[in-house]
């Protein structure tokens, strides 16, 4: 009798994700308990300084080599001179700065009238009223000069960002290897704190409008690159084949086939460029950029809420106007005329805009208020608003409520959470983050999460990073508890949903640091005010994506639930919310990204996190430290973005959703 044996070769099967993840969490908990018992080695609690690489010193050495030895500083100074000429020209035209060509300023009424005509061409009377009304408000509220200081940089930075982004996007589309290198760079650029953009701009391009224009341009380039590449990749093969059959050269294919076919995506990129430029040009007030941002900072410093609110409204109106007009440009199809159509018919709106501009320019020479609104003629009600707010804050009931909220959050929630997170050993913290990524997303994400947080630990800024993360998680958790129920209730009725989404748009377009004022006035210089300022900003995407997720639940699913006799709550919990979860997860991810952005601005309240250290770097030339701190924020933000989006994609695939 013979016995047949079968040999198995290969490696042992890998542990299931759940088992491995729970084991990692168990190990992290055990290490934390050992630390509390005083039995954990000190080097496992915090990495010894001896093994912390001097990243900042290395970066400073590279920076000094590039700046001095390679002559980059001399080159950027030449570029600065050229950029100053352009900025001086726009400043002269828009608000009368005494520079070439010495023909400004253009009357505010001429700009308002011309913009109204452009608005009518793009979107009819409503758009015309919005566009013209925005500039009328800006002039009559007494903010024309500071608004035009901001716009004089915006009209230079936005075209620069568009041109550079378009060229790089086309290059990435043509070269997959270049695209593969560019993608991670763009991911980092989109998550870097805005302070990290400001210091290099100051060092290479001087303090003021030139540095502001450069920082604004660089900040706005990434979405233009991404949308250009996406649009060109989506051009249908049939369109390409038709161009080749027509005998087009490479340049003709790009100019007359690819770019027109990718028009929608490219114009969406233009919209994003304009909005990011407006957001950043306000924030460049921190490096001496005059305009709305600088005035808002000055008003905030003296707690003039009324004037701050009026400036915030102006920024919101400008943002909404530019957003709506650029979006209308995206959807508006090019007009085609028969051969021989007269010029004045083909370009009637252009002629109307020129006519309105010239007409009001001439009228303004006779009617002074149409050229410049004096202080006595201004509609500003800033002082009256300040009086109302002070009266509101003096009400006993308001003080009792805010004091109670501050006490409960500070004593029972925020301080214990901060102390607990700081008490966790570094290695245990990294293990826990990696385990969470493994359970939620997968092995690849777990490895990257461990690498990212491990690198944060190696920078030597671990405690500051943990405090930053604690502020983000605390604010987003409260935002989740408030934002999701608001979104669920609002999604029930179309009118309510539209009203709430309008409120979200308005809240998102307000300058981010304006939220610091009510937080400080209500809750003082405390951790509560930091969290509250982040909370308002980060709650917007949670509300928005909850509404969108519930709106996009397939009708057949809700109809099936109705036919099965489900109650409203059963339908919500068992059908609508599960199907909306992938979309809601995107909102949660956006909330965390917004929170990481806002927590840096909240450093002005007096935090002890990375934002405070980043703010200090602006006072000197410590570029290495600036980059290291910015990378710490980026690595933490990228970890959450990677894990949440992977979970959302997997959930969509399991549910069969596009």
UniProtKB/Swiss-Prot annotation:
Cellular component annotations (GO), alphabetically ordered: ATP-binding cassette (ABC) transporter complex
Residue ranges constituting the ABC transmembrane type-1 domain according to the UniProt record: 147-326, 465-644
PROSITE patterns reported for this sequence: ABC_TM1
Membrane topology value: Multi-pass membrane protein
Pfam families cross-referenced by the UniProt entry: BPD_transp_1 (PF00528)
CDD domains: TM_PBP2
Biological processes per GO annotation: choline transport; glycine betaine transport
Localization annotation: Cell inner membrane
Membrane-spanning intervals of the chain: 20-40, 103-123, 127-147, 153-173, 185-205, 212-232, 273-293, 300-320, 349-369, 420-440, 447-467, 469-489, 517-537, 585-605, 627-647
Chief location of this protein within or outside the cell: membrane
UniProt-recorded Gene Ontology molecular function terms: amine transmembrane transporter activity; carnitine transmembrane transporter activity
InterPro entries, A to Z: MetI-like, MetI-like_sf
Keywords in alphabetical order: Cell inner membrane, Cell membrane, Membrane, Repeat, Transmembrane, Transmembrane helix, Transport
Induction info: Expression is induced by TMAO.
Assembly information from the UniProt record: The complex is probably composed of two ATP-binding proteins (TmoW), two transmembrane proteins (TmoV) and a solute-binding protein (TmoX).
Task performed by this protein: Part of the ABC transporter complex TmoXWV involved in trimethylamine N-oxide (TMAO) import. Responsible for the translocation of the substrate across the membrane. Is specific for TMAO and essential for TMAO metabolism.
Family as reported in the entry's similarity comment: Belongs to the binding-protein-dependent transport system permease family.
Protein name: Trimethylamine N-oxide transport system permease protein TmoV
Organism: Ruegeria pomeroyi (strain ATCC 700808 / DSM 15171 / DSS-3) (Silicibacter pomeroyi)
């Amino acid at each position: 009798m013979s016995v047949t044996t079968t040999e198995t070769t290969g490696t042992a099967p890998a542990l299931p994700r759940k088992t491995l993840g729970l084991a990692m969490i168990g190990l992290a908990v055990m290490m934390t308990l050992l630390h509390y018992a005083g039995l954990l080695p000190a080097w496992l609690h915090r990495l010894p300084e001896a093994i912390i690489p001097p990243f900042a010193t290395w970066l400073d050495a590279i920076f000094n080599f590039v700046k001095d030895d390679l002559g980059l500083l001399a080159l950027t100074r030449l570029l600065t001179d050229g950029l100053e000429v352009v900025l001086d020209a726009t400043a002269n035209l828009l608000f009368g700065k005494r520079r070439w060509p010495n023909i400004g300023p253009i009357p505010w009424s001429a700009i308002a009238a011309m913009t109204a005509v452009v608005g009518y061409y793009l979107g009819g009377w409503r758009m015309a009223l919005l566009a013209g009304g925005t500039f009328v408000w800006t002039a009559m509220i007494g903010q024309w000069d500071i608004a035009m200081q901001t716009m004089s940089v915006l009209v230079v930075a936005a075209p620069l960002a568009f041109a550079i982004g378009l060229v790089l996007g086309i290059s990435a589309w043509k070269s997959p290897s270049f695209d593969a290198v560019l993608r991670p760079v763009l991911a980092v650029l989109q998550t870097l704190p805005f302070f990290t953009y400001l210091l290099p701009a100051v060092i290479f391009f001087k303090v003021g409008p030139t540095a502001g224009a450069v920082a604004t341009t660089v900040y706005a380039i990434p979405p233009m690159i991404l949308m250009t590449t996406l649009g060109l990749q989506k051009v249908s093969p049939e369109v390409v084949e038709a161009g080749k059959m027509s005998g087009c050269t490479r340049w003709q294919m790009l100019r007359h086939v690819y770019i027109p076919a990718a028009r929608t995506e490219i114009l969406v990129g233009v919209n994003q460029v304009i909005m990011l430029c407006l957001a950043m040009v306000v924030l460049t007030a921190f490096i001496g950029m005059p305009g709305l941002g600088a005035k808002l900072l000055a008003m905030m410093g003296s707690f003039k809420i009324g004037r701050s609110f009026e400036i915030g409204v102006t920024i919101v109106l400008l943002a909404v106007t530019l957003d709506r007009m650029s979006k209308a440009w995206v959807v508006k199809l090019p007009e085609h005329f028969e051969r021989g159509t007269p010029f004045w018919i083909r370009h009637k709106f252009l002629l109307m805009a020129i006519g309105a501009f010239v007409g009001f320019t001439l009228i303004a020479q006779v009617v002074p208020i149409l050229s410049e609104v004096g202080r006595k003629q201004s509609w500003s009600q800033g002082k009256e608003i300040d009086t109302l707010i002070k009266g509101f804050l003096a009400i006993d009931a308001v003080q009792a409520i805010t004091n109670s909220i501050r006490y409960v959050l500070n004593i029972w929630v925020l301080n214990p959470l901060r102390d607990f997170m700081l008490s966790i050993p570094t290695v245990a913290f990294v293990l826990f983050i990696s385990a969470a990524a493994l359970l939620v997303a997968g092995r690849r994400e777990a490895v990257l999460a461990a690498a990212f947080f491990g690198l944060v630990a190696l920078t030597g800024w671990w405690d500051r990073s943990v405090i930053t993360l604690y502020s983000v998680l605390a604010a987003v958790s409260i935002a989740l508890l408030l934002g999701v129920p608001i979104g669920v209730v609002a999604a029930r009725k179309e009118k309510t949903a539209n009203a709430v989404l309008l409120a979200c748009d308005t809240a998102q377009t307000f300058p981010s640091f304006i939220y610091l004022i009510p937080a400080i006035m209500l809750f003082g210089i405390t951790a509560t005010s930091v969290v509250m300022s982040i909370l308002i900003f980060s709650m917007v995407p949670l509300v928005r994506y909850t509404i969108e997720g519930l709106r996009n639940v397939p009708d057949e699913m809700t109809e099936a639930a109705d036919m099965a006799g489900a109650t409203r709550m059963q339908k919500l919990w068992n059908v609508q919310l599960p199907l909306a979860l992938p979309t809601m997860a995107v909102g949660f991810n956006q909330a965390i990204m917004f929170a990481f952005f806002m927590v840096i601005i909240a450093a002005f309240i007096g935090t002890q996190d990375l934002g405070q250290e980043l703010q200090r770097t602006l006072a000197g030339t410590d570029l290495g430290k600036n980059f290291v701190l910015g990378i710490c924020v980026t690595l933490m933000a990228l970890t959450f973005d990677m894990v949440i989006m992977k979970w959302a994609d997997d959930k969509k695939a399991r549910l069969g959703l596009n």
